[in-house]
Amino acid sequence: MKFDRHRRLRSSKTMRDLVRETHVRKEDLIYPIFVVEQDDIKSEIKSLPGIYQISLNLLHEEIKEAYDLGIRAIMFFGVPNDKDDIGSGAYDHNGVVQEATRISKNLYKDLLIVADTCLCEYTDHGHCGVIDDHTHDVDNDKSLPLLVKTAISQVEAGADIIAPSNMMDGFVAEIREGLDQAGYQNIPIMSYGIKYASSFFGPFRDAADSAPSFGDRKTYQMDPANRLEALRELESDLKEGCDMMIVKPSLSYLDIIRDVKNNTNVPVVAYNVSGEYSMTKAAALNGWIDEEKIVMEQMISMKRAGADLIITYFAKDICRYLDK
C-alpha cells in the first residue's frame, strides 16, 4: 500500500527546526508596564502575578532589565494620583506616562515607546471618553479632540508610535490629522480598532484602576460574537490612515487575526491580554501546566494565525526562554 511519509520531516529536532514554519523572536514583542506617580513603589498586582505597578523613580530598573533581555519596544499605562471627568491627566505635559517616556528615552534612545492613547485610566468614571449628561454614554465626537491632545503630548514627550485604544469612531482620522498639523507626519498609528468588549480584560482594570464606575463599554467596544464587523473596522481604520492594526484579545480571537492578515498588508498586532496571562500564570503556579511550553505554544499560535507583533506581559519570560 502506498502512502505519504510525513514523519520524515519530524525525525529529529534539527530536522524539525529546519522546516519550522513559524517563529517567535524578541523583536516581535512589546512589553506593557504600569507606572504610578508615588515614589518608591514596586507593588505586585494581585491578579497579574509577576507584573508590578512601578514608581517613576524606580522605573529605570525595570527598563534596564527589559532592555538587557532584548526587549526593544514597551508600552506604558499610567496610574495617576488624580482623576477628573474629562481625563485631563492623559494630556498633561507632566503626566505620569509622559514622564515615564522621557525617563526611558534618556536611558535608551533606541527603545521604542508605544503610547496607549486613551482616557479611561484618567477619568473618575472609568470610561474611555467624555460622558454625555443626557444619554449617560460616551460622547464620541467630544472625546476625539481630547484623544488628539493626548497623542500630541505623548509624541512631544518622546513616544515613537501612537496606539489609540478607546474605540471612538473616527479616532484614527482625527489623530492622524492632528499629528500631521503638529508636524509629526512620520509618527505611525497602531490602531486598537478591533477591540472586543471582552471579559478577559479584568486583571488589567485592577492594574490600571480603570474599571467603569457604571455600565460597561459595550456601546463602543465590539461584540465578541461578531466576525465581519472586524473587517468593517479594519477597512475604516486603513482609510483613515492607520499603519498597524491591533486585535484585542488574541487567544480567543485567532480567527479574527487570520481574517485581518488576509485582508491587509499592514503589520498585524496581537494583544495577549491580562486575563489570558493570568489564567496561564495561575495554572502554572498551581503546578498544573508547564508554563514555558504553554506560553511558547500560545505565542506560536498567534504568530501562526497571522500576527506580526505581540503585546504581552510574558515578554520578559519569553526572552529568557529564547536565551536557553
Curated annotation (Swiss-Prot):
Binds 1 zinc ion per monomer. Its EC number is 4.2.1.24. It comes from the Bacteria. It catalyses: 2 5-aminolevulinate = porphobilinogen + 2 H2O + H(+). GO terms for biological process: protoporphyrinogen IX biosynthetic process. Its cofactor is Zn(2+). 5-aminolevulinate 1 binds at R205, R217. Keywords: Heme biosynthesis, Lyase, Magnesium, Metal-binding, Porphyrin biosynthesis, Zinc. The keyword Metal-binding applies. 5-aminolevulinate 2 binds at S274, Y313. GO terms for cellular component: cytosol. Mg(2+) binds at E233. SUPFAM superfamilies: Aldolase. Pathway: Porphyrin-containing compound metabolism; protoporphyrin-IX biosynthesis; coproporphyrinogen-III from 5-aminolevulinate: step 1/4. The active site is at K195, K248. Zn(2+) binds at C118, C120, C128. Belongs to the ALAD family. PANTHER family: DELTA-AMINOLEVULINIC ACID DEHYDRATASE. Catalyzes an early step in the biosynthesis of tetrapyrroles. Binds two molecules of 5-aminolevulinate per subunit, each at a distinct site, and catalyzes their condensation to form porphobilinogen. Homooctamer. This is Delta-aminolevulinic acid dehydratase. It comes from Staphylococcus epidermidis (strain ATCC 35984 / DSM 28319 / BCRC 17069 / CCUG 31568 / BM 3577 / RP62A). The gene is hemB.
